[in-house]
Amino acid sequence: MKKLLIIYPHWIPSNLVGVQRARLIANFLPRHGWHPIIVAVHPDYYTEPLVTELTKTVNADVEVHWCKARKKSRFLPVGDIALRGFSQLVGKAVNVIKDEAPDFIWSPLPSFYTSLVCRRVHEITGVPYGLDYMDPWVHDFPGARFPNKAWFAKRAAMLLEPIAAKKVSLLTGVTSLSYQPVIDRNPHLQGISTGYMPLGFDPSDYRLKPDNTRLLWDGDGDVIPIIYAGAFLPEAHYYIDVLFAVIAEMRRAGKLDQRLRLYFVGTGRGNLDPVSKYAERHGISDIVTEHAERISYLEVLHNLSQSFGVLAIGNRERHYTASKIFQTILSGQRVFPMFHCESTVVGILQESKADNFLVKYNPSIPEREFKNIVARYFAEFINPNNPWAPNLSALDKYSADYSAAKLVRLIEKALCDKRN
């Protein structure tokens, strides 16, 4: 059996979204003739809360090697664990390669600095490596102005990405739009093995029960709960602003069930206004609850499955794929999605017949017309008499099993290209 070394600084029991990419691929690699080996920083050095129940989601044949890192402190105010554990990740990966002789190295991004770890390990060992872009590294950071952090982040990305990608043998991503700009900026990469795989899903995750089965709306009485789970991204603010304006107007017109409640969880704490601020602005803060902190991945699945419906809010960028779309559809509850009309999510929703209430954003549509579209589909979404019967079998080709199989094919092509 061939071996894939996955270098990713976080690993279970981390509750970060990026860990799911590495976990889902690793769980299914053995089905396709590859043994997964993980190199990660030990959880003792994470700054985020740990969720031990997530160990239930990792298959027993996934091999994990831990390394140390420098701890974040007032003397080292660096949050990114790939930076704090850079030399340790390199050292551990090199030792694993000496002992296990893996055939290929692969790393999901972000953390983007892990790409530099891979480049360094390749320089030392000669083992070819691939980078997996879940998000673009070089892009226009919201609010980037000299000399703020966002401005420096973009400049750092522009400087470091060519170094990280210089000798890469494979580029993958959740969509081709994630990695194609890397090739455009680095023309010498033309012709290397490339391909995209969705984050996908593992159906067995939905059979696992969280340790905490309490629902977000427990204690709120007789309510109709609608949930949004995930980060509140900068480009999603426009959607929330329009949606809340629509809900406020429906309420004033007496067209909103008084039991309707919206619960936002895991939205994070960014520099822009939180969801709660938009709710206040539109006068609906009494029916909107925001929990900025994350809850366990298994708790999210449990809450989604018990809700009336799920909000799937994307952003106004066409490359955005919303990996969480699978968990929303598989929740068994109706979904209200808002995405750019060219996002790959639109095709997934249409194929699975989960597009009953789909709002497609088109930059050419006037704002008033877009608001009317949102109002029409949201009214249909909250009407329990409207049908909801997605074709879940259509999602099979987006499963983590399928993604792992495709990754294996791409790696084997990259290895073949390198031999030739």
Name every feature range the model reports, one short phrase each.
Residues L177, G200:
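Carbohydrate-associated surface elements
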Residues L5, W217-H237, F244-A245, S403:
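Conserved donor-binding/catalytic core segment of Leloir-type glycosyltransferases
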Residues Y361-A375, A379-K413:
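A charged, aromatic-enriched C-terminal amphipathic alpha-helix characteristic of glycosyltransferases
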Residues R259, Y263-G268, L272-E299:
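Nucleotide-activated donor-binding/catalytic signature segment of Leloir-type glycosyltransferases, i.e.
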Residues M1-K68, A404, E412, C416-N420:
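N-terminal subdomain of nucleotide-sugar transferases
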Residues Y113-L116, R120-I124, W151-L171:
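Membrane-proximal helix-turn-helix segments that form the acceptor-binding/catalytic region
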Residues P9, R70-P77, D99-E100, T125-P162:
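Acceptor-binding helix/loop patch of EC 2.4 sugar-transfer enzymes
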Residues S169, H302-H319:
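Acidic donor-binding loop of glycosyltransferase active sites
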